[in-house]
Amino acid sequence: MPLAMELDFVQPRQSFTSALSRGSRNFFGRSKRWSRWEFWPPYLFYPPVVAYIAYLGIRFRSWTLFTAANPAIPAGGFVGESKHQILDHLKDAAPWLPFSGLLECGVPTHRLAEAKEFMRRQGLQFPVVLKPDAGQRGAGVAIVRSLEQLNEYLMNSSFPVILQEYVPGEEYGVFYYRHPGDARGRVFSVTEKRMPVLLCDGRRTLEELIHADDRAVCMSDFYLRKNLDRSQQVPAPGERVQLVEIGTHCRGAIFLDGVDTITSALEEVIDRIAQSFDGFFFGRFDIRVPSRQDFMAGRNMKIVELNGVTSEATHIYDPKLSLFDAYRVLFEQWRIAFEIGDFNRARGTRPTSVTDLLKATREYRRLAQGYPE
């Protein structure tokens, strides 16, 4: 096998899929995707989780009690919340934040001028990150490397956009919670995010290499769309080709269980940052950092995003973990969300109504239809 997904390099060999036609390889990839639960579509994976949430709703006498877990975030961060407003709540943790600015809807040329002025004022150079202010699962996130790409993104976006400093390095997801009244919170989960990298043999095209890999073939449709302009190129032998840039599982990143990176130093820093956000108790920090050593020491970190109640402990997508492991973690996660919501309800926080939650979901889906891939 000529490739490696930043996990383990192996010697090149001829794969079964290399002998297949392009159509057959695509069919093989889609079929293999169904055999690995981490790639299942939401409608197949989430029914047991939804059933457990319904059970918790009966037990705690509120279907939407989880929305009270984070009183400072609309609907607790269930859907459609402003990422920019959340980062604003973390201003007391400014050393841990990259420069970010919000480009409201408006005339594209005016937005471009605003973006250029923001970059000038903050001393930012390309690349920068653009993403919808309300977004989930990496939808609409782009790394732009030129003024032309920036202009193209803004010309095709009719929604509020966050322009953020690009932070190089490694990426981690840190799931945190704190029961109201407790002096300290807890790091519940850490996910190491790896970008898929192919080790090329100098003989096959990028498309053939993607189809030859046991894991990459499961997401071949997505990888080929993201690399359409070079899919028929033959990279040099030994060349490493990174397939995606965004650290989201459904967009091709590899997620690994990072439990061994949790240290007292890391927990102390995360807890201090979380408690600077009054009314936040439950969610996941997405963090960029120069190295694993820096991360474990809780230093040189930048929080690129903070997600609320619909965050997942994404280490469950580690290929080593079973479907049973994933459900066990998610059930515990949702139980904690309901427990925190119950405590906050007793202190006067009102859960979002089912009607308002459905309305927010419909509005987000309408907005997200216009997001670039």
Could you describe each region identified by the protein language model?
Residues 3-12, 290-373:
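C-terminal active-site "lid" helix and adjoining low-complexity regulatory extension at the edge
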Residues 6, 16-30, 122, 152-161, ...:
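A short, terminal or domain-edge coil/loop segment
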Residues 15-126, 136:
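Conserved N-proximal alpha/beta basic substrate-recognition cap immediately N-terminal to
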Residues 72, 82-225, 263-267:
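Active-site nucleotide/adenylate-binding loops and adjacent lid/helix of ATP-dependent enzymes
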Residues 100, 174, 287, 306-308:
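A structural signal for short, well-ordered beta-strand segments
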Residues 138-140, 256-257, 315:
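A generic structural signal for short coil/turn motifs at secondary-structure boundaries
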Residues 169-171, 180-186, 279-282, 295-301, ...:
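Coil-to-beta-strand transition motifs
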Residues 210-297, 343-372:
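A long amphipathic alpha-helix within ATP-dependent nucleotide-binding catalytic cores
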